[in-house]
């Protein structure tokens, strides 16, 4: 059973947002391979995520045997999230929702961004239907202590498109299963917390 307090949720959602927003740098990958994240992995394994964490660990071990590991992981990221919608699992709600649903999502997301005065780095050029924006809003709702709003946001806005997104991620073959395991962790946490 997954039991997380608010601080743990915020930390884990932030970690997932960072991993799923952009490719890991060579330095970040080295931190993973050097065990900097071992305490987090151990904690998540205790939260009924052992299978997914084992996949992450095995992927990191597999990468440690490659001379340009960070480039291989970047290629996995690109193949999974950056190609066209036929070949990638695009991390945008617009790739999975009907036009009507998307318009409702965008209106609500934009309302929350304004309400919580959240601004994003415009150099990233991510529209408000990007996964990172949704996760940042979830983190903000968690920080505000609004458990019911967080739950409703997860149920009605995140899972509405993340379940088909994750199904597509799982079907795409890459050198490692690192990102497939990460998206499984996200879906499992959202479904069980």
Curated annotation (Swiss-Prot):
Transmembrane segments: none annotated. InterPro entries: Chaperone_TorD, DMSO/NO3_reduct_chaperone, HscB_C_sf, TorD-like_sf, TorD/DmsD_chaperones. It is found in: Cytoplasm. Pfam families: Nitrate_red_del. One of its GO terms (cellular component) is cytoplasm. GO terms for biological process: protein complex oligomerization; protein folding. Gene3D superfamilies: 1.20.120.1820, HscB, C-terminal domain. Keywords: Chaperone, Cytoplasm. PANTHER family: CHAPERONE PROTEIN TORD, CHAPERONE PROTEIN YCDY. Belongs to the TorD/DmsD family. TorD subfamily. Involved in the biogenesis of TorA. Acts on TorA before the insertion of the molybdenum cofactor and, as a result, probably favors a conformation of the apoenzyme that is competent for acquiring the cofactor. NCBIfam families: PRK04976.1. This is Chaperone protein TorD. It comes from Histophilus somni (strain 129Pt).
């Amino acid at each position: 059973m997954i039991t997380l307090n608010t601080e743990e949720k915020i930390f884990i959602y932030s970690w997932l947002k960072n991993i799923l927003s952009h490719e890991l740098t060579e330095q970040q990958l080295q931190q993973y391979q050097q065990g900097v994240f071992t305490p987090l992995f151990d904690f998540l394994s205790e939260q009924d995520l052992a299978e997914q964490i084992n996949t992450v660990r095995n992927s990191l071990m597999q990468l440690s045997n490659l001379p340009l590991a960070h480039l291989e992981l970047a290629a996995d990221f690109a193949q999974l999230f950056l190609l066209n919608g036929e070949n990638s699992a695009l991390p945008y709600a617009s790739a999975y929702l009907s036009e009507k649903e998307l318009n409702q999502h965008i209106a609500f997301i934009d309302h929350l961004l304004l309400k919580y005065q959240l601004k994003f780095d415009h150099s990233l050029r991510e529209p408000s239907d990007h996964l990172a924006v949704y996760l940042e809003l979830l983190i903000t709702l968690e920080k505000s202590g609004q458990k019911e709003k967080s739950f409703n946001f997860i149920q009605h806005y995140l899972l509405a498109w993340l379940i088909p997104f994750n199904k597509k991620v799982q079907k795409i073959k890459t050198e490692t299963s690192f990102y497939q395991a990460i998206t499984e962790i996200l879906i499992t946490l959202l479904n069980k917390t």
